[in-house]
């Protein structure tokens, strides 16, 4: 009884080994047999008729296995591209991606104001010589209504033509950059660029490139370089400062930080912003009361009956 049981188990092990080898062999043979039979499970029993509008050669060439075979058999190599010939200017895909990320190149009055407010604002500026004046009554040509536009000081600054420019990451410190930027604040753009060209500061070259970039952006908006001046210019930390160990005597160490900064500026026009600021300063001076040596104030305290001199 035990002998027959052992013999049956031995036969079962042999059959499983044979079946597993056959199944593995059949799995490997299946794709080849299907490819030879044109993809039919019945092999040569049925005929694989070509589809209408396509040739047999087109189907074979379009199959994945044939495409791999053609690619492996092809002796021609892809043409090599010279990396030095690719620049930022001639890379069309990169330029399209940069343009898609940027905001549209237009003045703030065209993008922030509604059509009616834009007409009133432009009419107000046209009446007052190019800049906005408070409490000005405006009458549009196609309407009999009269309008008065009220804007805050912040809104007036935003709507006036201006150019915002920012630099790249600069290897310098805020203390060194401030010495140069204080000199350039309030100057005309062209004069500021000349000052940067003749300055011995290392950061002057990056600041000059920033101002030239702002001039180009202003020309796209229709602003003349001779009419631009630096309204605001400042610097700040760009973050991610590099640090390294400073080894000292007697096993002491320190940490040296390498600062990185950025420079940003706002360019405005002399024909609009400076004229408005001069007009507001003139109004403020006219409203100021005249200075007198002894003001007309009530007498405080007890005077007494004795004359005082």
UniProtKB/Swiss-Prot annotation:
Present with 1800 molecules/cell in log phase SD medium. Residues 40-63 are annotated as: Disordered. One of its GO terms (cellular component) is mitochondrion. Belongs to the universal ribosomal protein uL22 family. This is Large ribosomal subunit protein uL22m. The gene is MRPL22. Component of the mitochondrial large ribosomal subunit (mt-LSU). Mature yeast 74S mitochondrial ribosomes consist of a small (37S) and a large (54S) subunit. The 37S small subunit contains a 15S ribosomal RNA (15S mt-rRNA) and 34 different proteins. The 54S large subunit contains a 21S rRNA (21S mt-rRNA) and 46 different proteins. uL22m forms the wall of the exit tunnel. One of its GO terms (molecular function) is structural constituent of ribosome. Component of the mitochondrial ribosome (mitoribosome), a dedicated translation machinery responsible for the synthesis of mitochondrial genome-encoded proteins, including at least some of the essential transmembrane subunits of the mitochondrial respiratory chain. The mitoribosomes are attached to the mitochondrial inner membrane and translation products are cotranslationally integrated into the membrane. GO terms for biological process: mitochondrial translation; translation. Keywords: Mitochondrion, Ribonucleoprotein, Ribosomal protein, Transit peptide. Disulfide bonds: none annotated. The lineage of its organism: Eukaryota, Fungi, Dikarya, Ascomycota, Saccharomycotina. The keyword Ribosomal protein applies. Residues 1-25 form a transit peptide. Its main location: mitochondrion. InterPro entries: Ribosomal_uL22, Ribosomal_uL22_bac/org-type, Ribosomal_uL22_sf. Residues 48-59 have a biased composition (Basic and acidic residues). It is found in: Mitochondrion.
């Amino acid at each position: 009884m035990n002998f027959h049981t052992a013999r049956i188990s031995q036969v079962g092990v042999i059959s499983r080994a044979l079946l597993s080898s056959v199944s593995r062999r059949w799995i490997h043979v299946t794709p080849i047999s299907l490819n030879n039979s044109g993809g039919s499970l019945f092999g040569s029993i049925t005929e694989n008729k070509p589809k209408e509008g396509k040739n047999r050669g087109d189907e074979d060439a379009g199959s994945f296995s044939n495409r791999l075979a053609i690619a492996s058999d092809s002796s021609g190599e892809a043409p090599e591209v010279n990396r030095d010939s690719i620049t930022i200017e001639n890379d069309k895909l990169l330029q399209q991606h940069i343009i898609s990320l940027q905001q549209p190149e237009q003045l703030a009055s065209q993008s922030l104001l509604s059509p009616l407010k834009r007409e009133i604002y432009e009419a107000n500026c046209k009446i007052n010589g190019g800049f906005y004046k408070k409490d000005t009554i405006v009458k549009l040509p196609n309407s009999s209504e009269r309008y008065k536009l009220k804007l805050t000081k912040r809104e007036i600054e935003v709507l006036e033509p201006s150019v915002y420019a920012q630099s790249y990451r600069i290897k310098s410190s805020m203390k060194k950059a401030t010495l140069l930027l204080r000199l350039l604040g309030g100057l005309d753009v062209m004069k500021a660029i000349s000052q940067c060209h003749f300055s011995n500061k290392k950061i002057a070259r990056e600041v000059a490139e920033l101002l030239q970039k702002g001039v180009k952006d202003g020309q796209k908006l229709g602003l003349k370089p001779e009419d631009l001046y630096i309204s605001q210019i400042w610097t700040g930390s760009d973050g991610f400062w590099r640090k390294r160990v400073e080894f000292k005597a007697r096993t002491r160490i320190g940490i040296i930080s390498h600062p990185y900064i950025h420079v940003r500026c706002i360019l405005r026009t002399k024909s609009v912003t400076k004229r408005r600021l001069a007009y507001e300063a003139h109004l403020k001076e006219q409203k100021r009361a005249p200075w007198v040596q002894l003001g007309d104030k009530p007498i405080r305290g007890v005077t007494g009956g004795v004359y005082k001199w």
